Each structure stands twice: as C-alpha cells, then as structure tokens.
UniProtKB/Swiss-Prot annotation:
It is an enzyme of class 7 (translocase). ATP binds at G8, K9, G10, G11, V12, G13, K14, T15. One of its GO terms (molecular function) is ATP binding. InterPro entries: Anion-transp_ATPase-like_dom, ArsA_HSP20-like, ATPase_ArsA/GET3, HSP20-like_chaperone, P-loop_NTPase. It comes from Prosthecochloris vibrioformis. Anion-transporting ATPase. Catalyzes the extrusion of arsenite. Its EC number is 7.3.2.7. It catalyses: arsenite(in) + ATP + H2O = arsenite(out) + ADP + phosphate + H(+). Keywords: Arsenical resistance, ATP-binding, Nucleotide-binding, Translocase. It comes from the Bacteria. Belongs to the arsA ATPase family. This is Putative arsenical pump-driving ATPase.
C-alpha cells in the first residue's frame, strides 16, 4: 500500500491538497483511503460531507475517515487506564484527574498511527493519504515510534522479567500489594501497543512505499517551519519526495494591495526553489473561490498533478545511507537545513544517537560497527557524514584478545 503523508503549517491548505490527491488517486483506479489525524476535522469540510470514525464512501475507489482519538484510546488503552486510575485514586487523586493522568503525552496521536497498520493489513486499499495536524504536532506524531522505543523496551522487559514472575507470589502475601499489581489484561495491552508501534515505525520509514509531502505558503514563517520539518523528518528516516507551495497570486495581478503581496511571494518563491533543491517544488495558484466538494477537488487535483499519477515517487533519494570507502564506513544523514553547531553525535552499544536541538534519532548500527566510536562528524552538501574507522575495530579486537591472554 502506497502511503502519502501531507504536513505543513496551520492554514497553508494541506487538507485541500490531501483531499485532492486522494480524489486523483481514485480517478486513476487506486482504491484510496484518506485519513485525517487533525483534531480540527477539516476533511469533512473539504468534501462537504460528514465523516465518522470509520471509512465513509465518497465515490468509486475513494473512502475518507476522521479519526476520533478518544474512541481509539478507549478501545486500546481501557484496561491499562482502569488499572492506573484505581492506583491513583487509592493515593487520594480525584476520579477525573486520575483518568487524565493515565493518558501519556502523545497517546491520542499514537492510536491514530495504529490505524495505519490496521488498514494496510486488510488489503482493501492501494493507497493511504494522511492529512495531518500542523507541522509541530505531526513531527511529534511521526517521531513517537523512535522517541518511545527505548523506554518501551525497558518497560516491556520489566513486565516480562519482574512484574509477571512476581505478581502471583506477592499478591498472596498481602491484599495491599495485590491491589497494586497490574492485571494480566493490562500487561497484555501494553505489550501489544509496544509491538504494534515498532511495526508502524517500519511501515512509515519504508522509503519504497511511504513518503511525506510538505505544503507551505510563500511566507517567511511558513518557509522556516517547513525547513525545520524537513530536517527533522530526514533525521527520523522519513523520505520527503515533494514540496507544494500553495495560494500563489496570479502573475497578472496588478492591483495595488495584491501587487505588493505578489512581489513578496515571488521573492520567497526564489528562496524556496533554491533552498529546497533538488526536491521538486510544485507551485499552486490562489483560487477565487473555496475548494469545497468533489468537483472542486477534481479541478484542484488536475492543477497539482496534471496527467501524473500521485502515487509516483516524485524524488527518490533515501534520507539515511550507509557507505563504505576502504576501511572507512560512513553513516550519512540528509539534514538540509540543520545548523552544524546544534548537532551532537554519540554511540551506546550498537546504537548511534544523533541529536539536533531537542530532537533525537537512534540508528541501529550494522554488527561490523558495534563497539566503535564515531569519528568527527562533518556537515557537507546538506548531508551529515559520520565516519567509523574499521581498522580501529581490528585494533580494539586485538587489544581485547591480548588482555584475555
């Protein structure tokens, strides 16, 4: 299943672009589902139809859905929430506050992600279009699998090797202790979520099937936010294959007020084409009316894609590469707008940590690099090059053997 994720600053028109893309995919014979994770629920407005928590048929080959995160939360997290609510209330926390405390930050978005796996596994759809929340929320959403993976592994091991073996003996010793032991269904729910989260990460970073498309306006704040988004998306291994600049004024516009805005847009458009190169940049005009309903979306879709299939890979270069040159093995990350001063790199075990500002990426290293310290990272031609010297690995191995002797 081809997965296209659209994101951008609030108000740039990403819902219209997402809906139009889905319409075009369906016209080309792809069984398409467009799914909105934006709590604003603009997708209903775009199609001019009331959408629910399950797929609604729009036309042939096209279904749409607006996720209700609280419904998914209750379905997937109820047993865990029930247990922690009981524990918090035993400590004197009020019922409503106890319920709220059981929901971890990002948990609502997490269950929106789990739907991706569900719809992929059904085999009912050839394409999934994700209409996401504004950029900041989307980055938080897409980085959840990486951000939580280390903690989840730790919790899972605690459950497996400590909680489960000791729960029955301890519960027999004291009723009070038994009260705090999580029930089996709560432990199983946590395990299931952890396993599915790892699967979601694999699906979204499958650079053959999944790509992200950035929607922006030719305005300074929109451009800056999109630049940051591109850097962090590449950091987490998501392939971006297209940039769409929306709401551009007609080049023939010559009225005083709009003429000034047109000049501003043209100035920023040049910066966008230069800065985001070699990504393809699609320019989309400002319409003289709202883009609402299937007919309007069909027109908009033709302006975006023409005769091109939206499922095509518009730019095909992976955001992470492993390159070997002699005894030097390089991990290369595409970080087009990163500030080298903000980059920190270190290795723990078989994991390479790359941190930019408050965003962190964990990359599992090949076995051949395990135990090696990275050399000095170099930022060159929009790529971060992190070298590992394989010759030093041999030296480390010989030293260990000597110490054993």
């Amino acid at each position: 299943m081809r997965i296209l994720t659209f994101t951008g600053k609030g108000g740039v028109g990403k819902t219209s672009v997402s809906a139009a893309t889905a319409v075009r995919l369906s016209e080309m014979g792809h069984r398409t589902l467009v799914l909105s994770t934006d709590p604003a629920h603009s997708l209903s407005d775009s199609f001019n139809l009331q959408l629910g928590a399950e797929p609604t048929k729009i036309k042939e080959n096209l279904h749409a859905i607006e996720v209700n995160p609280y419904v998914d939360l209750k379905e997937n997290w109820h047993s865990v929430q029930k247990y922690y609510t009981r524990v918090f209330m035993a400590q004197g926390v009020s019922g409503v506050m106890a319920d709220e405390m059981t929901i971890l930050p990002g948990m609502e978005e997490l269950f929106s992600l789990l739907r991706i796996k569900r719809y992929k596994s059904t085999g009912l759809y050839d394409a999934l279009v994700l209409d996401t929340a504004p950029t900041g929320e989307t980055l938080r959403l897409l980085s959840l699998p990486d951000t939580l993976s280390w903690g989840m592994k730790a919790v899972k091991n605690v459950n497996k090797y400590i909680v489960r073996p000791l729960s029955k003996p301890l519960s027999k010793m004291s009723d009070k202790i038994a009260y705090y032991i999580p029930p089996e269904d709560a432990i199983e729910s946590v395990d299931q979520v952890f396993d599915e989260l790892e699967d979601i990460r694999d699906i979204l970073t499958d650079n053959v099937k999944s790509t992200v498309r950035l929607v922006m306006n030719a305005e300074k704040m929109s451009i800056k936010e999109t630049m940051r988004a591109l850097t962090y998306l590449n950091l987490y291994g998501f392939k971006v294959d297209m940039v769409l600049v929306n709401k551009l004024l007609d080049a023939q516009e010559n009225s005083g007020y709009l003429e000034k805005w047109k000049g501003i847009q043209q100035k920023y458009l040049g910066e966008i084409e230069e800065g985001f190169s070699p990504l393809p940049v699609k320019k989309l005009k400002m319409y003289d009316q709202e883009i609402v309903g299937v007919k309007s979306l069909e027109v908009f879709a033709h302006d975006i894609y023409g005769d091109t299939d939206p499922s095509d890979m518009m730019y095909d270069e992976p955001p992470i590469k492993f390159v070997r040159k002699g005894d030097i093995y390089e991990v290369q990350l595409k970080l087009m707008f990163a500030n080298p001063v903000d980059i920190d790199v270190w290795v723990t075990g078989d994991e390479l940590f790359v941190q930019i500002g408050n965003q962190r990426k964990i990359i599992t290293l090949p076995v051949s690099l395990t135990g090696l310290e990275p050399g000095d990272a170099v930022f060159r031609d929009k790529w971060l090059h992190i070298p590992f010297d394989l010759e030093k690995q041999g030296q480390h191995h010989r030293t260990r053997e000597f110490n054993k002797a």
